[in-house]
Curated annotation (Swiss-Prot):
This is Aspartate carbamoyltransferase catalytic subunit. Carbamoyl phosphate binds at residues 59-60, 109, 142, 145, 294-295. Keywords: Pyrimidine biosynthesis, Transferase. GO terms for molecular function: amino acid binding; aspartate carbamoyltransferase activity.
Length: 339
């Protein structure tokens, strides 16, 4: 793992193809540990990992906690409801308290974009030996989700040896609230870097023309590797057109808490036009897996029947793979810590 250069994990835009390979290889190894009878390794024994979630979370926070414990780390979970924030303390002062307590890794989720990046900058400027791991900031980035989705798809396409090449030339369609989705952005970086062709689909209000600026980022898609032309991104408005010849489909939750008024006509109309169902999947012209990062709104972005059809959806696999993926990230960051 000597090629790992990151002191923080903030955004997958900074990842090289070698970084993705490293994470996938480690995740494969840690998945075996996670499934073993002992379930634990002493890799991060004595390290302190603090989970600071300033935004509600169930799956991600629990997944990070289990991942840290599987590596034998000491874990502290921050709760907004029982914190000094209610007494007027700022989030920065709360975070600095954990740094003063000797936290080796801070796992941070915040509703505002770039909070983890600003904290990482503060840590670096002040030469503090603490790593920052972004667990989701606004609708900017969610790197661990992008990586676990990458691993889930790589494992589906190549169960015996999941790798970055498992995604090469695969057609992945992402449907839904792209505008407000940090998951979509992280998946775009990961999937295109590994050579996938990604199609985005959603109503104009949730996939506006301005998003094309993100898609045309000079480091995204085929521009990431101009020699091998790895990856590409397309935008389509018609669900039927978007699903045609897809190898996998990811549907996203409508983030109503982030939406402005009148961004959607109504939920029934949205479901009729963009809902993923057994019937709409026929447009793929073959049996394909369906992913959803959760939480799921049944009957809005995905049918109730499809949520319960484990022969098609990989939702439980995504949750399962979240633990070894986050073990890999914590392990890599923990390796850089000085005693």
């Amino acid at each position: 793992m000597n090629n790992w250069k990151h002191n923080h994990v903030l955004d997958l835009s900074t990842f090289s193809l070698e970084d993705y390979k490293t994470v996938l290889e480690l995740t494969t190894r840690f998945k075996d540990v996670h499934k073993s009878s002992s379930k634990k390794l002493p890799a991060l024994h004595g390290r302190l990992i603090a989970n600071l979630f300033f935004e509600p979370s169930t799956r991600t926070r629990t997944s990070f906690e289990l991942a840290a414990k599987r590596l034998s780390a000491d874990v502290q979970n921050f709760s907004v409801s029982s914190s000094s924030l209610s007494k007027g303390e700022t989030p920065l002062d709360t975070i600095l308290t954990y740094i003063s307590m000797g936290a080796d890794i801070l796992v941070i989720r915040h509703e505002s974009t770039n909070v983890p990046a600003e904290l990482a900058n503060y840590v670096d400027i002040n030469n503090i030996n603490t790593s920052i791991l972004n667990a989701g900031d606004g609708f900017h980035s969610h790197p661990s989700q992008g990586l676990l989705d990458l691993f889930t798809l790589a494992t589906f396409f190549n169960p015996n040896e999941p790798s970055t090449n498992s995604l090469l030339n695969k057609k992945i369609t992402i449907v839904g609230d792209i505008l407000h989705s940090r998951v979509a952005r992280s998946n775009l970086w990961a999937l295109t870097a590994c050579g996938a062709e990604v199609t985005l689909c959603g109503p104009p209000s949730l996939l506006p023309e301005e998003f094309i600026d993100f898609v045309q980022n000079p480091r995204l898609g085929q521009n990431f590797d101009p020699i091998n032309k790895r990856g590409s991104v397309f935008i389509k408005r018609s669900l039927k057109d978007a699903l045609k010849n897809s190898d996998a489909v990811m549907t996203l939750r409508l983030q109503k808490e982030r939406m402005k008024q009148n961004m959607l006509k109504d939920l029934d109309s949205y479901y009729a036009q963009y809902g993923i169902t057994h019937e709409s999947l026929k447009w793929c012209e073959k049996k394909v897996p369906v992913l959803h990062p959760g939480p799921v709104n049944r009957g809005v972005e995905i049918s109730n029947r499809l949520v319960e059809d484990n022969s098609i959806n990989l939702i439980s696999k995504q949750v399962e793979n979240g633990i070894p993926t986050r073990m890999a990230l914590l392990y890599l960051l923990g390796l850089n810590k000085k005693d």
